[in-house]
Each structure stands twice: as structure tokens, then as C-alpha cells.
């Protein structure tokens, strides 16, 4: 959807599905994860990323790989290396490349009258009189004669996002480690009046922790512990930004004001919806009418033991893997 915090969708073999599922099988260090989990993994923590499809996927993973397989491997430390610390901080500004231009109230009313007359073979009384058009143009009373630029009122010109990541890696003769901590802060493009009871703009915070430790019990036995923790929150309107945008596209500038003045810290909305000659709902009310806050946390931990069986047959090895995942 493009909203802050929304997950990505992955399609390897197109939208056609096998077994009613279109998304590929995603394996992180050999453990199946969701696209949402993958979306939150910092790029700095990924060692390799590969894609399997068709026969190469089904030969190994059977029907589970019918829609393709994504193999993701996270980074790990190297033996006998000093600790290496990497820090990155990013600040970005996003702005729509193209924004629509809307007619103001007087232009809309004159154009509406012309279109109304063009559809009739005889002279008709225009929907908007010259007096109403003149009053709207003068701005004498914006609550009685509204002239609302819905797009300019509801959407900001751009938004700022921030991201910070710090990771440490290294190792000794038998143990290696890699640890990463990342914080993300993303905001949306929604705006509100100064006397609004709350800020409707999407505010998304996210923290990710990755910890990979490998220890050699013997020269042929290795234990790997991997832990990925993700926590975050998102605040914003209950209605999606795409739906709010649609309401802006449908509304005209003169049917009703965005809101009526009330107390210092409160406002009263105009008509939520009009019927005769309707041009949709009040976009501002649609945005401000409900508020939502979501909190999430995910813990994904795996432990595997690898045993080299080269003393039996060259190239032979065995691996036991246990995984635990908890989310809410």
C-alpha cells in the first residue's frame, strides 16, 4: 500500500497460485518466516539472498516450493578476528513526484453550471446562483460558503524518515558472533488543523535486534544460536491513506466545510455525507473520525547442531535444528 510500516508482497511465479497460495516460501537461515518478518530485517544483517523457482525449488522443497523459494542468510562473525563495529545513520525526505491540481470553488461552480446547461435542450435554473458564486469568491463566510482545497488541507508536501543501525562482529578460535540493532521511524503525509484533538498522521516506530553466535564444541561439532527480536508500534487513522485519498478525489470544494468552529480544543465536522447531487463524504471527517494504535513484537530463535561425518563418508554431515517463534 505504500503506507509506513506496511509489508511488501513477493511473487516469483506471478499471481497464478498453487494450492491457493501465491507467496513464495521464505527461509531465513533454514527457518520459515513470513514476508512481514523479512520486511523488518535490516539490510546490514543479510549475508546472501537467493531465489529458487520451478524445478529447482520443487525438487528440494516439494509442493511447499511450488510458488518459488527465497533463501536468506544472515551475517556471522569470523574466527580469530577483532571486533568490528559499523554504525550508519540515515535521514530521508520523501515527496510525491506528481500531485493533482483541483479547481477552486468558484471555478467548480461555474463549470458545473455550464455542464448542467449543456446537457439540457432548454434553459434551466443553474445549480449555483451568481450570488452564491460571488459570496464564495469573496470568502465572506467560509462556513456558509465553503471553498475547501481538500488535498492541500489533508496532505503534507512531504515527510521525514529516520533510520539508525549499529552492528558488531568478530570471533576467537572457537566462537564467532554477530550482533545488530536497528531503529526505524517512519511518518506519513497526513495533516490536521491546529485545534485538532490529535495528530492523525501515521507514526511508525520499529526496533530490530539480531544476534548470531556460533561455537565449536569439537573440531567436527558446531552449535549455532540465532535470535531475531522485533518490536514496534504504529499510530494513525483507522482508515487507510489510500481510502482517504479516494475521498479527496470524490469531494468537491463547495458542498460543506471541513469542520465548524467549536471550543478551543474541539471542532465539529460538517456533513459526513450528502445525498442529492452527492460528491462523497467529508474527507477530513473520514480521516479524523477514528484513531488506531497497534503494537507488535516478534521473537524468532533457532538452535542447530551440525556434525561433520566425514570420517564415515567424505562430504557427509548431519544437522539438527530447533526453532521457536512467538509473536503478538
For each of these PLM feature ranges, what is it?
Residues 1-11, 15-25, 31, 38, ...:
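Membrane-proximal, glycine/serine-rich, low-complexity loop/turn segments characteristic
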Residues 26-27, 87-88, 317-326:
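Extended hydrophobic secondary-structure segments that form protein cores and membrane-embedded regions
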Residues 53:
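Flexible N-lobe loop architecture of eukaryotic-like protein kinase catalytic domains
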Residues 298-300:
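Short, solvent-exposed loop/turn segments enriched in Ser/Thr/Gly
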Residues 314:
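Glycine-rich, aromatic-lined ligand/substrate-binding cores of catalytic
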Amino acid at each position: 500500500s505504500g503506507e509506513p510500516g506496511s509489508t511488501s508482497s513477493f511473487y516469483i511465479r506471478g499471481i497464478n497460485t498453487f494450492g491457493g497460495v501465491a507467496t513464495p516460501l521464505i527461509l531465513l537461515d533454514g527457518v520459515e518466516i513470513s514476508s512481514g518478518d523479512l520486511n523488518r530485517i535490516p539490510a546490514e544483517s543479510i549475508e546472501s539472498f537467493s531465489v529458487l523457482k520451478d524445478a529447482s525449488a520443487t525438487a528440494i522443497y516439494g509442493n511447499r516450493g511450488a510458488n518459488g523459494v527465497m533463501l536468506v542468510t544472515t551475517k556471522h562473525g569470523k574466527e580469530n578476528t577483532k571486533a568490528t563495529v559499523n554504525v550508519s545513520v540515515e535521514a530521508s525526505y520523501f515527496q510525491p513526484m506528481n500531485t493533482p491540481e483541483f479547481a477552486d470553488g468558484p471555478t467548480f461552480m461555474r463549470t458545473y453550471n455550464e455542464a448542467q446547461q449543456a446537457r439540457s435542450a432548454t434553459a434551466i435554473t443553474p445549480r449555483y446562483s451568481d450570488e452564491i458564486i460571488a459570496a464564495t469568491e469573496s470568502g465572506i463566510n467560509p462556513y456558509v460558503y465553503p471553498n475547501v482545497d481538500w488535498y492541500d488541507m489533508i496532505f503534507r508536501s512531504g515527510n521525514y524518515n529516520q533510520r539508525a543501525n549499529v552492528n558488531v562482529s568478530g570471533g576467537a578460535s572457537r566462537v564467532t558472533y554477530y550482533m545488530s540493532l536497528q531503529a526505524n521511524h517512519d511518518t506519513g503525509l497526513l495533516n490536521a488543523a491546529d485545534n485538532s484533538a490529535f495528530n492523525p498522521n501515521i507514526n511508525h516506530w520499529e526496533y530490530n535486534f539480531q544476534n548470531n553466535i556460533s561455537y565449536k564444541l569439537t573440531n567436527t561439532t558446531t552449535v549455532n544460536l540465532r535470535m531475531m527480536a522485533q518490536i514496534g508500534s504504529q499510530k494513525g487513522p483507522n482508515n487507510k491513506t489510500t481510502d482517504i485519498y479516494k475521498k479527496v478525489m470524490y469531494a468537491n470544494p463547495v458542498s460543506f466545510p471541513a469542520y465548524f468552529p467549536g471550543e478551543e480544543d474541539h471542532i465539529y465536522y460538517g456533513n459526513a455525507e450528502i445525498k442529492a447531487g452527492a460528491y462523497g463524504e467529508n474527507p477530513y471527517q473520514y480521516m479524523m473520525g477514528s484513531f488506531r494504535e497497534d503494537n507488535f513484537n516478534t521473537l524468532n530463535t533457532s538452535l542447530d547442531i551440525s556434525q561433520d561425518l566425514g570420517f564415515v563418508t567424505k562430504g557427509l554431515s548431519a544437522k539438527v535444528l530447533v526453532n521457536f517463534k512467538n509473536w503478538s
